[in-house]
Amino acid sequence: MVKAPRGYRHRTRKVFSKHIREKGAVPPLSLLMIDYKPGDKVHIVVNPAIHKGMPHRRYHGKTGTIIGKRGKAYIVKITLGDKEKTLFIRPEHLRPAKA
């Protein structure tokens, strides 16, 4: 037997797959043009067609708070268990949370 690879995207076959009508690399421009402010709540929804600024699969589906901006990416603070994590995520992988 050969040892299975343990890359950054291992075990993401179902998590990072798109439905047939969603396929293609370009996300909706309305999602990219949203300007998030510090304190805004966002959902982390990974777009698997865009690899830049993609968070790890463990953060897919989590909700966090915008702290600031660094370059084109946003600094997002989330709670994972009893720890607070700081992530740098590009807007292609963020959705505004409805308050």
Swiss-Prot record:
Superkingdom: Archaea
Keyword Ribosomal protein: yes
A GO BP annotation: translation
Gene Ontology CC terms: ribonucleoprotein complex; ribosome
GO molecular function: structural constituent of ribosome
Keywords: Ribonucleoprotein, Ribosomal protein
Family: Belongs to the eukaryotic ribosomal protein eL21 family.
Protein name: Large ribosomal subunit protein eL21
Annotated organism of origin: Staphylothermus marinus (strain ATCC 43588 / DSM 3639 / JCM 9404 / F1)
